[in-house]
Amino acid sequence: VIDWINAELNKSGNASSLYQKLEHPDYGNLVNHEKLFSGEIKTKPFSPARLWRTSPNVFDNIKSNYGGDARSIRQPFLVEDRKGIKEYANLLFADSAVVDVLLVNAGYCADQLIQKGQIYKDIASQKSAPTRDQLEVAASQHFKKVVFRDPTKEELKNYIALFTGSAKEGIHSEALRVMLMAIMMHPESVYRIEIGLGESDTSGRRMLSSTELAFAISYAITDRHPDSILLKAAESGKLRTKDEVHAQISRMLEDESIEKPRILRFFQEFFGYNQAHIVFKDEARSGGFSYYGENYPVIYERDADFFVLNILEKDKDVFKQMLTSDEYFILNRQTFRNTVFDFYEQNKELIDKGQLTEEKSKELLKRLGLKNWKELNKKYYLHGFDRGFNGSPEVIKKIGKEIPTEGRIDNRNKDKSYQVISQGMHTLYQKYPMAYDLKDGEQNFLLPQPYKRPNRAGMLTHPAWLIAHSLNDISDPIRRGKWIRQRLLAGVVLDVPITVDATIPEDHHKTLRERLSVTEAKACWRCHEQMNPLGYSFEIFDDFGRFRTIETLDKLPMVNGKFHSKPVDSRGVLAGTGEKNIDGDVKDALELIHKMANSDKVRQSIIRHVFRYYMGRNEMLSDSITLIAADKAYLESGGSFNALLISLLTSDSFLYRKTLTKE
């Protein structure tokens, strides 16, 4: 039937819009989930031949190679800050706006190189025509820094011809500038070339060449160009088989010195918790959501990062732990100060004498979860007066716990020595733990962490996720339910018709769930049935992420100093997993989450999103073999994300390209 529909659409000429929709991030779930994982599809997987625009993160890491002050080089490769996976290859182009910025950057860098680079200064200033050797060295040197490979003979010939043609007026500096700018505008400095320059097979697929693979692997795992080991493997012909690719990916994943920010970024984009800071919260309701530039939702996002990283470090049952773990990190600025003070209390005699053994210094680093002191500022987002802390006895003595009860206090004595203040929590931080259901002074944020928290289960009950998926002054059952339906249950929710008024009716005497009963009308329920029963279960949390059993009706006048309230109704329904022992009624979000964590469909749905992130596109039915193998690798490894990643990055979907024709 599907094949017949496709044939009829092709005949009518309306197929192109459908194909375009299937390629968009919002419509990946239109590809049938059951068919993808049934095993009935035997087509050899591949990705379409493509150019994938350079990532803004990669550009930030390599722009220092271009010449000039990296701070003056503008970011050309902006990506829409949308929820979900952002970088799809087919949606990113070097349009006129991108090219304009690239040209400005190229001109600036060329000018800087001519002013400061001796080889370029010599060519620009000499009266006689530069030799071919001079031009080849100049072009090759800049080319390698920009494109990360040696230019071919043909490329060198073209650049020298460009210089020669531009130098007819005898102005060598301008001709050199044109040549250097042309190098910076090389397609490989703008796009990742993934057209399949390797060997072809009988099905019309072409394997990525060794060079294409080196860049594809590096940009899949890191935000940097290939390291010397990967480039050497490509140049020596040792990146042509799956086993050779497997060896390089395993090496990079196991090497702790190689930063792998893209792994964390997947979970940020998948869960969307890194959007918490853009949801406005009224200060009168929150009691203050920032202090000295410290935006609490931003700190919650950082806490969530550590929640993710802790699970990834263990690399066991990763998806289940992401959904169910009750171990949370609470890492605001006081975490650092309080832990250092606690360390001081335990080692006071030694520190007061200015003595601290290497063993004790390592103990403090370990408690703070640091490899060295250089990591400190980045990890704990410190106040200016804490930056530069180096673990010496002198600076440890200057750390005191602050417990002002009224306003601020000066915790220094007249001789400017620091007074150590006894146990307690800075009152200005008492608003921060409210989202973790902590009472004032309940605990002091000491490290090491994590802390177990009651009434919580994984990322979907983390304050960062709950705030990110809320509205300005209310929770958001509809969008929370839609997120679960699409991200975890591979479901499709239709767009809101333009004729529908989606405004929630105001009634200050009703709870939000009661007000949303209008969506249960027959005309609305067809779509809302996919979302509301899932989202309602999260009504045990308010829009700040605080656990609750009653909903405060704070728009009504107070009575005897208190707002009216009603009990929370968090009953919901899980439907759509296709698993009889999992689908059914749930009393709240905690029961819902634990049920979903045991679902095959939920696990497979997450794997589909991992695929989209690393392949830069939606899956096709022809990717069935890849997805089934990835699911198998994940299960057989005990839930290892690294094993899943290796399976995907050594799959035919990653290694092979094919030119698609939409007939």
Region annotations inferred by a language model:
Residues V1-E663:
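Low-complexity, glycine/serine/threonine/alanine-rich intrinsically disordered linker
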